[in-house]
Every structure is written in C-alpha cells, then in structure tokens.
Amino acid sequence: MANNGCCASGSPLACDLGAISASDRPRYHELRRSVAASVIGKRELPDGLAIQIDTARIALPHLAEWISFERKCCPFFEFRIDLAPDSGPVWLSLTGRAGVKEFITEAFAG
C-alpha cells in the first residue's frame, strides 16, 4: 500500500491515524504490511476495490484485526469478506461513498 496504508495522498478523503491509539499503532502497521503482502489479485468494483487475499500469508483473524483498526481511522470504508467454499479464494471488498474507489485504488497501488 502506498503512503501509510491508511491515508492516500491527494484524496478528498482523509483517514485519521490518531484514531488508533499510540500503543496499537505498531500492531496496526505490522498488520497493514501483512495485508499488503498477501494481495494476490485485484478487481475493480463500481464503488471500490476487491482484493484477493492469500490466506497462507495472513490468517483470517489477523485480516479481521486489521479491518477493526481501519474502521477506526477510515470510518468511511465499507468492508466485506467473501469466503469461497472448499478453501476457495478469499476476497476483501472495500467500498464506500463517492471518492472511496479512487482512494482505495491509490492505497493499494503497486
């Protein structure tokens, strides 16, 4: 993820990293790096982005923990996790109001 993974530059939307306690920020950054390293696919959505997650690189409970932090600093995101049957693909959808798609696309560039 670009920047700090919470706040894409040049976007009309802004996250508040201060919403995550100072004591929790190291864990947040650790999880953010794990999420970024686990992305194995991307799919544009009308109002956001879906990212395919390699669960060999990040466990589902850790993905959920990262989402809990993101909900604090970026409350304008909507999250959905789709788990396919028979150990199929895991997709995390990040969507929201106008501008969120561009914000998320920039955050997950690369």
Regions found by a protein language model. Give the residues of each.
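Amphipathic, interaction-prone secondary-structure segments
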Residues: 60-64, 68
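A common structural junction motif
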Residues: 68-77, 108-110
